[in-house]
């Protein structure tokens, strides 16, 4: 690489998809019924699995937050289930959504309508269930499930189709640098998106530590704030533009809806 000097810097490298944090996943991804729409090349394989599964068990996973587009893990389940329902196969398929979180969705107002679709598709939701290992050849997925007292039990679940959402972390060159906060993400003032210790550095998008959902809609709003505040800092003016935490995550719950 090469070193480039700067007077001001905007940091927005995105988020790292940490496939390696799930034992055995990388070796079996894209075969043995294991897929992920977070890997764009595998979207056709997801569709292939959905179309060809006539019976059995379909597992869908969601890792601990933060992740990019927090609704995407559910979208895969809803759209697959809608296809099976429309083609009269759903009654022979056991659909299960394993989420490492304690709630179905982070915005409480949306949980009741989403639960209606969970019921419509006869899906089972398992909370505090984190995928930690995949044995592709055996078609077994292992989950660490935490109870209300914090005790963790590892459970093996057989599958015919497994849609995985990988854990997501800041890139190493951020998390291991002085620019990171305790979580490893790029530290910012959540209003100005300026680094609290390096006044000439700003950040936006999935890598920054602002508490909003990590979505393209959030980045679209953040870039305006960063541009205005960067110019203000350059000219010695007060940073008057403030990010309000806006984010959006469209949730597709059936074909065309």
Where does each model-flagged region fall?
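FAD-binding core/adjacent interface of flavoenzyme oxidoreductases
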Residues: 1-88, 149-152, 163
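FAD-site-proximal beta/loop scaffold in flavoenzymes
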Residues: 18-21, 26-54, 158-222
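A structural signal for isolated positions on well-ordered beta-strands in alpha/beta enzyme cores
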Residues: 57-59, 94-96, 202
